Amino acid sequence: MGRIVIAYKIFPSESTVDLELLKEKIKTQLSDIASIQKFVEEPIAFGLCALIVNMVLPEDVEGILDKTEKRLTEMEEVGQIQTLGVNRL
């Protein structure tokens, strides 16, 4: 079974979003399909930070990237996501 590593930049919906709670929610929502490797908080402007999340996904599951992105964008704390990179392991 092949695996892929993907990095997303996740922009919170508001500057008041608690990033620690958002990290936990992401881990919970994706626990059945992804292995979270790390989170990095990246300052953007005016006190707003984005989350960079690196995760490992199974390559042989059809539509896994779409399913992952759908789960992320359905969270009310997430305003927008951006794919930073996808690589095979």
Predicted features along the sequence, with ranges:
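Long, contiguous binding/interaction regions
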Residues: M1-L89
